[in-house]
Amino acid sequence: MIDDNGYRLNVGIVLCNTHQQVLWARKYKQHYCWQFPQGGINIGETPEQAMYRELFEEIGLNYQDVRILSSTQYWMHYKLPKKLIRWKIRPICFGQKQKWFLLKLLSKDTRINIKSNKDYTFDRWKWVSLWYPIRRVVFFKRDVYRKVMQEFVDVIIS
């Protein structure tokens, strides 16, 4: 779903474990492209419903495996670089408008299954320190990642 300003409505997921680490996943066949799970909100879905759907589609977890600890107060935006905009596809998407969720893993991490869906998004995952993703995510997402982690840090370390 794309809003009137050309932003695709989306949810982002920060999944943390009991060691104050966050799940970091590599995009399928994109050796240097790592990110948090995220995905679009379908028409008729709430952000929370989209988050649970994406959680299952991308890392194979369901609502019983996690607990929502927090969500961002505001929607976060990032613009795509011009070379990544698909100019011939309508409506044109200029970037993402995201609601982020902080989740605590309740199950063992052996439940994480990045190949639970035939069209899987990721081919590897690992636990990383809290601030690691900000230095490693693709440049146009860094500001959003920084804001998200600043909003969630107190909850993660408590």
Swiss-Prot record:
Q: Which family does it belong to?
A: Belongs to the Nudix hydrolase family. RppH subfamily.
This chain's function reads: Accelerates the degradation of transcripts by removing pyrophosphate from the 5'-end of triphosphorylated RNA, leading to a more labile monophosphorylated state that can stimulate subsequent ribonuclease cleavage.
- An example Gene Ontology CC term for this record: cytoplasm
Name the SUPFAM superfamilies for this protein.
Nudix
Domain Nudix hydrolase spans what residues?
A: 6-150
- What keyword terms does UniProt attach to this protein? Hydrolase
Coordinates of motif Nudix box in the sequence? 39-60
UniProt EC number: 3.6.1.-
CDD domains, A to Z: NUDIX_Ap4A_hydrolase_plant_like
> Quick check: keyword Hydrolase in the entry?
yes
Q: Which GO terms describe its biological process?
A: mRNA catabolic process
Q: Which InterPro entries match?
A: Nudix_hydrolase, NUDIX_hydrolase-like_dom_sf, NUDIX_hydrolase_CS, NUDIX_hydrolase_dom, RppH
Citing just one GO molecular function, the answer is: mRNA 5'-diphosphatase activity
Cofactors, names only: a divalent metal cation
Q: Which domain of life is it from?
A: Bacteria
Please name the Pfam families in this protein's record: NUDIX
Q: What HAMAP family does the record point to?
A: Nudix_RppH
* NCBIfam families, per database record: PRK00714.1-1, PRK00714.1-4, PRK00714.1-5
Which species is this UniProt entry from? Answer: Blochmanniella pennsylvanica (strain BPEN)
Name of this chain's protein: RNA pyrophosphohydrolase
Enzyme class, spelled out: hydrolase
